[in-house]
Design a protein with these regions (language model features):
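Short conserved micro-motifs at the rims of enzyme active sites and ligand-binding pockets
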Residues: 47, 267, 344-348
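C-terminal alpha-helix
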Residues: 50, 54, 227, 396-404
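C-terminal target-recognition/interaction regions appended to catalytic cores
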Residues: 296-406
Length: 406
């Protein structure tokens, strides 16, 4: 047995051994060294099995970290990145909604401390799916100092900040230019960055934020990046969720930042899907036709309306009034407005059998598991789904961040 010491922290690294050549007394002594108890009554084969299992477990632990971090309170400001385990990377999810981002990051192995959202329905859904809590708060009235006092009572170091300041909320009522992010919820996000100084952040938003301008003609993204670049090395990514195992062509802006003192330059996350042909088609998430309730099918009046609207829009050059899914390809983007008529993504069997997607199918398109609880009226549920970050997309972004930091 050899002992490695690093910064006064010791870990025992077990060398590989041939347990089959040991007698029972040697095996019992080895069990004692490995901390295996209550084994004196075991026979030789049982002892070998116990020892090999312990060694295998130790090897896994050793690969995760070259040292065992003590149970003392650690100041993560001073803890080298390579000494941190995945479980020690703590996350706050701002504008968390019903939890799509948190679900993906949790599955990736990150530790969510808390979520915050202003919509009570979304927070109620969130809290039915996680051990930690989300809190229904207005960020303009919840400065990070207050958050820390109320919801981070153990004063855990926040390593990653995530969230997507709502594009439609790029303003606070009564204040200057509504498109100027300096007047917006975006600045509340910046306040949390400045206060917690996390190692990394992930900011998600619609692709349209890249072309938005203020009343003065300034590019919104330039103003945003001016704030973010102060303390972080940043990269702006335009990513398709369908490249990350999501059955939906949802295109999003993802800004990733790594704190400058870490001397890491983030790169664009690599697609998980190699070609467009390998993207997950919508047919993989559809419920069999015979199981679909009649209420999801369009009425004759609606079918006529779609046909008429299609013709009018063609004449005006606006495209189609309703979008029929190609079931051999990923779905169109599912927006929060889908609850109104469902015309953004329809399943067409023939000219007289066209239907909307069910709640379960909408969840699957956003890569929520079927057992993920989203509560409220149909309208509330669909808005929550449409506003969410696709879980599988968040999962792969989480894995990307973990790889950067470790």
């Amino acid at each position: 047995m050899k002992t490695i010491s690093n910064n006064n922290t010791e870990s025992n690294i077990t060398e590989k051994m041939d347990t089959s050549k040991m007698d029972k007394l040697e095996l019992l002594e080895k069990c004692k060294e490995l901390g295996i108890t209550k084994c004196s009554s075991k026979n030789k084969s049982e002892l070998i099995k116990l020892i090999n299992s312990k060694i295998k477990l130790q090897d896994v632990i050793d690969k995760e970290s070259n040292m065992t971090i003590s149970n003392e309170v650690i100041n993560h400001h001073d803890t080298p990145i390579d000494e941190l385990t995945t479980q020690s990377l703590n996350v706050i999810d701002l504008f968390c909604g019903c939890g799509g981002m948190s679900k993906g990051l949790t599955d990736a192995g990150l530790n969510i401390i808390a979520g915050i959202d202003i919509w009570d329905k979304a927070v109620e859904s969130y809290n039915k799916n996680f051990e930690h809590n989300a809190y229904c708060e207005d960020l303009t009235k919840m400065p990070p100092e207050k958050f820390n006092e109320l919801y981070n009572k153990e004063n855990k170091k926040i390593d990653i900040l995530v969230g997507g300041p709502p594009c439609q909320s790029f303003s606070i009522a009564g204040k200057r230019d509504k498109n100027d992010p300096r007047n917006a919820l975006f600045m509340e996000y910046v306040k949390y960055l400045d206060y917690f100084k996390p190692k990394a952040f992930i900011m998600e938003n619609v692709i349209g934020m890249l072309s938005k301008k203020t009343a003065n003609g300034e590019n919104v993204i330039d103003i945003i990046m001016e704030q973010l670049n102060r303390n972080y090395n940043c990269i702006i990514n335009k990513l398709y969720a369908s490249d990350f195992e999501v059955p939906q062509n949802r295109r999003r802006t993802i800004i990733i930042g790594i704190r400058k003192d870490l001397n890491i330059l983030p790169k664009k996350p690599e697609s998980i899907i190699n070609t467009t042909q390998d993207r997950i088609p919508v047919k993989t998430i559809l419920i069999p036709k015979e199981e679909i309730d009649k209420k999801y099918y369009l009425s004759e009046k609606a079918l006529v309306g779609i046909a008429n609207k299609k013709g009018k829009n063609k004449q005006k050059g606006f495209g189609f009034g309703a979008q029929m899914l190609d079931i051999d390809k990923p779905s169109y983007t599912i927006p929060a407005r889908y609850w109104k008529d469902g015309y953004d993504a329809l399943v067409k069997y023939n000219e007289t059998e066209i239907r909307r997607l069910t709640i379960i199918e909408l969840k699957r398109i956003q890569s929520f598991p079927d057992n993920y609880i989203i509560d409220g009226s149909n309208k509330d549920i669909i808005i929550q789904i449409g506003n969410a970050v696709a879980c599988k997309f968040a999962y792969h972004i989480g894995k990307y961040i973990i790889n950067i930091l470790q």
